[in-house]
């Protein structure tokens, strides 16, 4: 079901001892005994730390970033419970959002007991090891391993990664607008939305041909402008012991949606787009 319970038992956690510093024209190499080498490169606005792991026994890594009490932090991907991350820790692990966002509520407890499907405040389909600070910098950890970003301490943020990351990147700016520009320069910018999305509502429908297009007709009958419909079960559904799921073969279901290509052409003639689960648009 895409729901995980992750626990850990740390046998040993020890601070790295700096044993050598090698400085060149544009980098500083920090050698920590025979465990890790950190290559630091900084310019006016950007600092990168590239790590070279020398001992493969290291499978956990903690990194602290100085903080202040008034600072706020945002990000860590799509976080749906709290905008400001301070005061909480956020595991970075892809999962279903789950039922409920609070383990103290009855609905979440019941979902956990019966189906292990209860959600928590940090459960998200899209976590990301990146955050933005009101001190006008962003930090990104280049790693795909499980991580936990802890913002509970007033004087530092502690980032835990279940491997030695390839790189930690910190970039700052004088304004939030400039910071956003630098973030999107690194990660990539989303393209502008097409003009047609502003033509009306984009409604979510499912349940077969009659119900889905029937809801569209009812909406149009009330003189509501519609730009498109999003239909996740266009490929059919399967009923399992843990609920309804899609067929996942990404072919239109000829029983639930007979003559779907024809229906799509009909609504296209009205200026309405059709989206499927994979965000293909007709």
Predicted segment positions?
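Aromatic-lined carbohydrate-binding/catalytic grooves of carbohydrate-active enzymes
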Residues: 192-282
